[in-house]
């Protein structure tokens, strides 16, 4: 990844902080080993200088001289003086309380102050022969040229340190990467937007167009086209990327409909038992929300009747029986309806001699149905035994993140071939449950797909792009061929 740099000077009364931010700093945790730039310095008004030697190398996550927990007090109402790597200078002002954010090149007052201060203090302590990429003997006024690079750097800084949510629109060529948010979360972290007359953002070039930040709420208005990575917060076009972040490689959750579209040939899907709806068999009582209301809310949110879609279709021309769990429906929990739909699908595949695919994405048994949900584990295991042992048919289990609890203990680990997605979280008991029960820390990554593969619990880890082709080859290897020979891929 190409890294660009800019200098940022904070004017804050007694101290001047000068640091450098990388274009790639998106989170608190380091992406790789960090090497600190060695020409950092703090220079106070009493001429106390703390310095290091020559620069060693770039780094790709934030390393500020200001403690992040004190960042609110530090920048509560301040003007920033910014100089990019092209030695262009800008004035950046924002006020947390008033939700005001402005970038302009009116540097008359700031230039006088900084030029005077730098001439008397900073330049006297730096030799002009130093090989500093960002050394500048003067700070000059320039035309306003706030490019996509500086927007991205400031955006990453704000996003990772002060939880900002609305977007700043750049006039650069790649504007969808230069969103700078215009409001800052409250101290409680709730992120609630506070309306104010200053909830406007000024555009880059001519500063004549004032637009409300609400017009650019991309995740709400265009969520059918774009998806935001919950690891690096980048926006991705979901149809092309298959919900895989190309920046950090993070695998985002997919709905059951998206997985059906990924695996099944267009126009060949036929759903089964779509009218089955969960009841409240044990009259589960909850102070927060009754079980029936939770079911209705999940149905409205997902458009599904329960946490799984089952049916038949063709995979590269090969007839298959497919069941796909949906984590968005009450965490993909397995209740009586989910168990019945899976059981009926397996029985249908047994009678029709179809290969079977079950895609797991679940938190386990549904506690609102008590022991009835636990019964589904035994019921599914029983029909799978008949399908595999008696009929000698072929079952592929695909484990996605997360797959835990009763689903892991039953249908998840009973496949003839067990495939997992990269980085999938797969476990019987969750990390928190183990730590609270055993009073021991669970090693990081011990419940990830890669760790389970090394221990022999999985047969393969397959990314989403080649998944359909891999499954098709496995079916043909086990004598399941396309109805039309021309459809072999």
From Swiss-Prot:
GO CC term, one of those recorded: chloroplast stroma
Entry's Gene Ontology molecular function annotations: acetyl-CoA carboxylase activity; ATP binding; carboxyl- or carbamoyltransferase activity; zinc ion binding
Pathway stated in the Swiss-Prot or TrEMBL entry: Lipid metabolism; malonyl-CoA biosynthesis; malonyl-CoA from acetyl-CoA: step 1/1
One Gene Ontology biological process: fatty acid biosynthetic process
UniProt-annotated location(s): Plastid, Chloroplast stroma
Binding positions for Zn(2+) per the UniProt entry: 229, 232, 245, 248
Cofactor note: Binds 1 zinc ion per subunit.
InterPro entries found in the cross-reference section: AcCoA_carboxyl_beta, Acetyl_CoA_COase_Trfase_b_su, ClpP/crotonase-like_dom_sf, COA_CT_N
Cofactor: Zn(2+)
Zn finger (C4-type) location: 229-248
Reactions it catalyzes: N(6)-carboxybiotinyl-L-lysyl-[protein] + acetyl-CoA = N(6)-biotinyl-L-lysyl-[protein] + malonyl-CoA
Main location: plastid
NCBIfam families assigned to the protein according to its UniProt record, in alphabetical order: accD
Functional description taken from the UniProt entry: Component of the acetyl coenzyme A carboxylase (ACC) complex. Biotin carboxylase (BC) catalyzes the carboxylation of biotin on its carrier protein (BCCP) and then the CO(2) group is transferred by the transcarboxylase to acetyl-CoA to form malonyl-CoA.
Protein name per its UniProtKB record: Acetyl-coenzyme A carboxylase carboxyl transferase subunit beta, chloroplastic
Source species taxonomy: Eukaryota, Viridiplantae, Streptophyta, Embryophyta, Tracheophyta
């Amino acid at each position: 990844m190409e890294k660009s740099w800019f200098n940022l000077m904070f004017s804050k009364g007694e101290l001047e902080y000068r640091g450098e931010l990388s274009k790639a700093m998106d989170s608190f945790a380091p992406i790789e080993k960090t090497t600190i730039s060695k020409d950092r310095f703090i220079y106070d008004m009493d001429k106390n200088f703390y310095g290091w030697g020559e620069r060693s190398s770039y780094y790709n996550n934030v390393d500020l001289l200001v403690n992040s927990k004190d960042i609110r007090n530090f920048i509560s109402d301040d003007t920033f003086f910014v100089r990019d790597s092209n030695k262009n200078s800008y004035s950046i002002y924002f006020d947390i309380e008033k939700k005001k954010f402005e970038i302009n090149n009116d540097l008359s007052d700031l230039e006088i102050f900084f030029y005077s201060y730098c001439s008397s203090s900073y330049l006297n302590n730096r030799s002009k022969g130093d090989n500093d990429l960002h050394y500048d003997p003067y700070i000059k006024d320039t035309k306003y040229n706030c490019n996509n690079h500086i927007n991205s750097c400031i955006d990453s800084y704000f996003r990772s340190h002060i939880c900002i949510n609305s977007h700043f629109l750049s006039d650069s060529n790649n504007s969808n990467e230069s969103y700078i948010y215009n409001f800052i979360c409250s101290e409680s972290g709730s992120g609630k937007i506070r309306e104010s007359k200053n909830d406007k953002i000024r555009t880059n070039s001519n500063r004549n167009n004032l637009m409300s930040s609400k017009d650019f709420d991309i995740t709400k208005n265009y969520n059918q086209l774009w998806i935001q990575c919950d690891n690096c917060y980048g926006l991705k076009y979901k149809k092309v990327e298959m919900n895989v972040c190309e920046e950090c490689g993070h695998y985002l959750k997919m709905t059951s409909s998206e997985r059906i579209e990924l695996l099944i040939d267009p126009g060949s899907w036929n759903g089964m038992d779509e009218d089955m709806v969960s009841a409240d068999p044990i009259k589960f009582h909850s102070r927060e929300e009754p079980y029936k209301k939770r079911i209705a809310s999940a149905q409205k949110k997902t458009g599904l009747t329960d946490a799984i879609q089952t049916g038949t279709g063709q995979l590269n021309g090969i007839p298959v029986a497919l069941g796909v769990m949906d984590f968005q429906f009450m965490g993909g929990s397995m209740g009586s309806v989910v168990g019945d739909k899976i059981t009926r699908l397996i029985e249908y595949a047994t009678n029709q001699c179809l290969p079977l695919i079950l895609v797991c994405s679940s938190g386990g048994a549904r506690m609102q149905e008590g022991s009835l949900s636990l019964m589904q584990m035994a019921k599914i295991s029983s029909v799978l035994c008949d399908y595999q042992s008696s009929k000698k048919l072929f079952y592929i289990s695909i484990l996605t993140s997360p797959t835990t609890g009763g689903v892991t203990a039953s249908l998840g680990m009973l496949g003839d071939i067990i495939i997992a997605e990269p980085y999938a979280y797969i476990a019987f008991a969750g990390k928190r449950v183990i730590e609270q029960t055993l009073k021991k820390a669970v090693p990081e990554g011990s419940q990830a797909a890669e760790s389970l593969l090394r221990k022999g619990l999985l047969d393969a880890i397959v990314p989403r792009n080649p998944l359909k082709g891999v499954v098709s080859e496995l079916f043909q290897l086990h004598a399941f061929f396309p109805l039309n020979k021309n459809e072999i891929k």
